[in-house]
Regions:
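Conserved phosphate/anionic-ligand binding catalytic regions in large, soluble enzymes, centered on
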Residues: 9-30, 129-141, 199, 211-214, ...
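Glycine-rich, N-terminal phosphate-binding loop and its surrounding beta-alpha-beta segment
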Residues: 43-103, 107-109
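Glycine-rich, mobile lid/loop segments that gate access to catalytic sites or pores
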Residues: 112-198
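Structural signal for hydrophobic packing residues in well-ordered secondary-structure cores
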Residues: 44-52, 84, 88-90, 112, ...
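Short beta-strand elements
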Residues: 10-15, 22-27, 80-82, 110, ...
Length: 226
């Protein structure tokens, strides 16, 4: 089992959805880089569910805690360990999944892969909460790049008119269904020649990272499939 992404700058994730905590270890960060705790927490809060009717009802504070690698507001050069404690868990809701896994989730394949020793509660290590350390690591990495990153939700269920989104989401919720959407991301300040010619091209590596997010079903670059 491998849970590490990256080469020069790496992130290793750990923990399960209903365990004591989930987190990550960031390695490759140079010493002396200023760590803006308020900015990191603000980015974490953007990801935090339970703030509206269109996200999961699970409400966690998602308070970031640094265990190592930061001293007096700056990186020390050693690995940066980050955790988020779990609190709002109802493990009894997942008892039935031991016999009847959820369609489209990792319940069945995780059980097969690890001979039933996996933690199925809340999706275990396959939970969407594992994206928490990814967001934290990405926020730290931005300090190294000098690039500007922007993201915007532009479509929900094929609908681009924002005024119709709430009605569409209400109807979908009443029907007990779910729908997809499109998030548009823009990066400026990217240096020319970034990436390798073939397997490690910028698009290849970005796609690798993006498809690690459980809900991502497709990635387009530039004009996409136009």
């Amino acid at each position: 089992m491998r849970n590490t992404f990256g080469n020069l700058f790496t992130l290793t994730t750990f923990g399960e959805s209903h365990g004591p905590a989930i987190g990550g270890v960031v390695d490759g960060m140079p010493a002396g880089v200023d760590i803006d705790m308020e900015f990191i927490q603000s980015e974490i809060n953007r990801r935090r569910p339970g703030q509206s009717k269109i996200t999961t009802a699970r409400n966690e504070p998602d308070q970031v805690e640094f265990l190592s690698g930061v001293f007096e507001g700056r990186t020390t050069g050693s690995p940066i360990a980050i955790i988020f404690r779990n609190g709002n868990t109802r493990s009894s809701d997942y008892e039935a999944l031991k016999a009847v896994p959820r369609p489209g989730h990792a319940d069945y394949v995780a059980g097969v892969k690890w001979n039933g020793f996996n933690d199925p509660r809340g999706g275990g290590h396959f939970s969407g909460r594992i994206t928490l350390p990814v967001v934290a690591a990405g926020t730290i990495a931005r300090k190294m790049t000098g690039m500007d990153f922007r993201a915007e939700l532009v479509e929900i269920g094929g609908e681009t008119d924002r005024e119709k989104w709430n009605g569409l989401l209400d109807r979908t919720s009443r029907e007990g269904d779910s729908i997809g959407g499109i998030v548009e991301c823009t990066v400026s300040g990217v240096p020319a020649g970034l990436g390798e010619p073939f397997f490690d091209s910028a698009e290849s590596l970005l796609s690798h990272a993006l498809f690690s997010i459980p809900g991502v079903r497709g990635v387009e670059f530039g004009d996409g499939f136009a």
